[in-house]
Amino acid sequence: MTTYSYNANTNVLEWVKYPNDTDTTRTNYTYDSMYRLATAAATTNTGSALSATYTYTDDLLTKLQTATTAYHFAYGDFALRSSIQVGSTTLASYTYTADRNRYLQQLTYGNQDFVRYAYDSYGRLTGQTYEDGSTVTYAYDNTGALAPVPDSASGIKTTYYYDLTDRLIQYAETGTGHSHAVGYVYDRENKLTSLTEKINGTAFTTSYTYDDDNRVSSITDRGITESYTYDAYGRVTQKVTKNGSATVLTETYTYRTVSGKPTGQIATHRSVSSGRTVTYTYNYDANGNITSVSDGTHTTTYVYDSANQLTRENNQAEGVTRTFTYDRAGNMTAWTEYAYTTGTLGAATATHGYTYGNSNWRDQLTAWNGNTITSDTIGNMLSDGTRTYTWRNGRELATVTKGGVTWTNTYNADGIRTKRTNGTNTYSYIYNGGRLSQMTVDGTVMNFAYDASGTPMAVTYGGATYYYATNIQGDVVAILNASGTAVVTYTYDAWGNILTTTGTLASTLGTHNPLRYRGYVYDQETGLYYLQSRYYNPEMGRFLSADSLVSTGQGILGNNMFAYCLNNPVCHADPSGHMVAFDMFIQALDGDGSDQEYDDESELAKKLKKSHALLQLFEENVEKFIASNAKDYCIYHGTFSTYSGTTFADKDLALSVGAANYTMTITKETRTAGFLWIKQEQTRYVATVIVHDIYDFTEWRDGSSFGSIMNNIAYIGQIMGYIKAYRWQAVFTIATDWE
């Protein structure tokens, strides 16, 4: 049981003790004379003392002192943030327009890179200029839609096209030697039914079908079809991948039941092809961390501390046990390897040490494995003993040099990498919606297909199609040929280091294939993973640069800005996908408390329209409407809770919406369909839905899941006043099929 203690006079929370806590490990809080949070402190079961101290000036947070580092926030007129410092070093400074609108005019990084912004008379962004002279310009047509966007750095111009309902129906990129266009087709319920991508004259079509609950029932991409079966809780129980009528891969899933209640935790994952059958079995601890994975031959077990950080990996297949230790700020301090054992450790076979010697920024790595690490002012790594790095536009990795070979990166206006070259070898990349769609390496073209959840499904290479086999964490563990035989097999450690690459095509397809651990893009020559916003070094288990939120101070409220996945690489990934939960949280952090509305085309509305819980309500209310014999319309209202399922969208809704209020206005529509004398009257039911709530954090949550941790961080922030509650509503329509 979790115990809470409140001050008898002021009713403020003084301490929290979780079931595994003692009086020495509980979390304690103190407050200033205005009852704002002054300190928060706790000690983990491994002895790490975690703490944070808050300082205010005129109701604005001006200093945050963590266990290792002090962050300072300065403000100018109208309480607009003017700078962020770590210790005595400036990370970012801000200037604003002199007019009453006070738009952000320039962001200057501590390394003197900058971005300058320009606006039109309507306050719309019209241009960005960078320190190297490169520019991105924006223009708008008479309807307010974005006109073609030229990018001087990449030489690519992007044009967007919309239909009469303001839905994006096509975007096109053009440049020297580059032509990429994507067109979208929607049904009457605004569900995407097909997507046609044309790359340098070659077209690929992806089509979608949906079941009665508006869940994707099949997806066909580049001629590969994957179909889905769901259980009563909306969980995927089977995926079948086919090439035409031939089944290549069948995957089935079972789920854990805890205390008689269903969960989204996968218990078994069986992957079957004609040449390969593997059954993975998973076990979990009370916090939902994966504690063991077995493939029927070998088992890997994992141990975590009370902060859910990975502290030990026992890898039976590799014959290695690894232990990991961290300081009180979540920085890894030692990575030690031993001969495989699940019991008492023997003599260490390898040790990688970490040193954090920057007195201003104690989270910044200064030495690793005996090598000196250098970084620039804002935390971008410059050298690590094996590689050297240069940067542009603040946080874009411009070059990587390893073994005397320099790789130069090129990015588009959105900061997405489009090319890397060493002068002899060149990789070109084309992305569609955050997914790598095509890669060309020295004239060899690879096209990629994905399933409904964004997991890699297939790749064309050398005139043949190959199929990805992945585990539930998204790692590409094998590549299969058309007969289902594995031609490439990969193994990884917990942090994504590639341990082995085997198979008949290991030296060709296995080397060229960029999609590896977690489906991330792997740069074979440098050993880095490209995660779009940052680069990740699996040898160190850290990012090369600080979280992008450092430039606004937002990331300070969360976890270590260099740590990868909360130091829990087994159970988490760092997708670059768009998170509604993140946007809504940032609105609470940086907003003024004003109401927010999300329309039919918003990411929130799109995910709500696929929510099993909301669609079930719609079905029930349609039945009530029919039974009522209403002539015009009926209005229904109440509350519903989003289901925290297994997909990224499910978890996003659970974090952002949780439980909310809804109003549903249902009407009946009729039409006559047919041809010549063969006509039929059809009917459907349409609902205009308003989902609304107050976005706030009014209570502490038990447990140490990611959602609970984020809620409790925000709970403290709301008490302090730097998180502002606001009302929000999403307005959208859903409809039944015509019958």
For each predicted feature, which ranges?
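Beta-strand elements of repeat-based all-beta scaffolds
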Residues: 1-86, 90-109, 113-130, 134-220, ...
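A motif-centric feature for acidic-aromatic and gly/ser/thr-rich catalytic loops and repeats
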Residues: 4, 98, 257-258, 352-358, ...
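Short, flexible loop/turn elements at secondary-structure junctions
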Residues: 20, 175, 180, 199, ...
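A cytosolic small-molecule/anion-sensing beta-strand core signal
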Residues: 377, 393, 472, 537-539
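Short, low-complexity export/processing leader segments characterized by acidic and small residues
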Residues: 417, 497-501, 537-544, 559-583
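Short linker/helix segments within small regulatory modules
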Residues: 553-556
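Catalytic toxin/effector domains delivered as secreted proteins or via bacterial secretion systems
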Residues: 591-595, 599-739
